[in-house]
Amino acid sequence: MNNTEHFGKLTERMQAFREEVLDAKPYIDAQRAVLATEAYKENQNQPRVMVRALMLQKILEGMSIYIDDKSLIAGNQATKNKNAPIFPEYTMEFVMNELDLFEKRDGDVFYITEETKEQLREIAPFWENNNLRARGEALLPEEVDVFMETGVFGMEGKLNAGDAHLAVNYQRILSDGLKGYEKRVKELRAALDFTDPESIDKNVFYKAVLTVIEAVRDFAQRYSKLAKELADKETDAKRKEELLQMSKICAKVPYEPANSFREAVQSVWFIQLILQIESNGHSLSYGRFDQYMYPYYMKDINEGKITKEDALELLTCLWIKTLTINKVRSQSHTLSSAGSPMYQNVTIGGQTTDKKDAVNELSFVVLQSVAQTRLTQPNLTVRYHANIDKHFFDECIEVMKLGFGMPALNNDEIIIPSFINWGVKEEDAYNYSAIGCVETAVPGKWGYRCTGMSYINFPRVLLCAMNDGVDLTSGKRFTKGYGKFTEMETYEDLLAAWDKTVREMTRYSVIVENAIDKASERDVPDVLCSALTDDCIGRGKTINFPFLQSQKDSSDILCHHLALQQHLRCTALPGASAFSLLNCCRE
């Protein structure tokens, strides 16, 4: 038996749905941008956090919705599958510069109609010098201008887009529903003392949270109504029943708690989707999916409401829907990240907080569903450890043999002690998940970019260290300089120059990050994402603001450490170069 047969095949309709999505031509989609522009214009007197809430509300009320005829789940990001919405509040610069070039790219080609071009031209003037990129650049101190001008720092991802790189608290969303969040916000808002100046800002934030919760509830209700309308016209009895069930589920979740596996899947998808309508930050991840979904799965299995095959088809549908999420990046950005990656990570396996193997029946079903779909999204990560279920780990290896690069493996034996060593509470360390391509974090508790986003061109930094602090590419001085390579007497002299140069460059990159983070705090607060991450509601601040005062487990120290680790991800090439230089010194 080959590996494909080992995991079985997609159902006929999921196979057809998969092919439809894979064959869909990605278009630039202006609808969100137009609605966002209208919301910003209509609410210029409002605090920015309220503008963002009203923007999301307007988008969710006004955007086109549809239900694919082969789908078991409702919810779309754009007017068609795989279309890429435009997020003008971050930047319009590259969009307008490349308006006639999207279809001519070597990679990550996007198609665009003349109507869409005209829509974007109409709204572009409003956003000129009025977005995150403009304000982020305005906050940069002069001392880092040379690094931005020469491109030695790769900061485009943070200037042109949202952040993400997290997993929200899906477990609480399922158990409490947004209704539970709403109740808490109302209680906290009622208890505010407005003689305290901070209460003014908290009140606005709480009002914004209530606005987006209402918007999400109404958005789901739109799908409930649409599913009912489609069911009334449907002639196939089975599909009619599915649409009626979908209508009932969408009328309930995510506002109400989920009580079944189908409700839980739909609730998770709505949140995963809407967070990527609110912001285009990638690496918005599902967290420990097999852990928080397991109670709903087993409840339905034990009560005979669902079979393993039903759950398998539902999950394959979820992963196909996950692939429909898209993002357009600038042409220069695509040179280093082609393939339209969204890095929506699903984590399974690992250990429980009481240090037992966490593999369960749903872990196997998730693994099988990903094996059947064989897609680039979601990214599947398996946490492994010394006592992991052997059969499960063997199955992971069988999936690897399929050759589509999944699952990735995260070693609990390394990651958990590292987290604890840096001050993370033990129970949180044991509950970590993957949040993107390679990063890890505590789901539902860590905020934006706990892993940093400054990409430093280390080969150029090495050459700079060898050239007394002067960049060989631009001829401009980067650092104070620590000698020329031709004048260094030993390999240790080179390493010392390299060490000092890297430290200087890292310091400058932190300055750049701080400026952009500050612009993000002020300009593009994400209200829904904040509400669903602990404990933004408790402190009355958005996720964009630092967590220093509210996190007591030293995880802020960890965040700075991980930011540095992000810098060091690209050191293989200069490391190899240094080794070659060592051989030259020896000769």
Report the location of each language-model feature.
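A conserved hydrophobic secondary-structure block that centers on an alpha-helix together
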Residues: 230-241
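A generic alpha-helix surface/boundary motif
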Residues: 225, 291-295, 576
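Conserved catalytic cores of very large enzyme subunits
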Residues: 2-206, 242-245, 249, 253-571, ...
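Extended non-globular scaffold/tether segments
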Residues: 207-219
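Short, conserved catalytic/metal-binding motifs centered on acidic residues
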Residues: 236, 556, 578
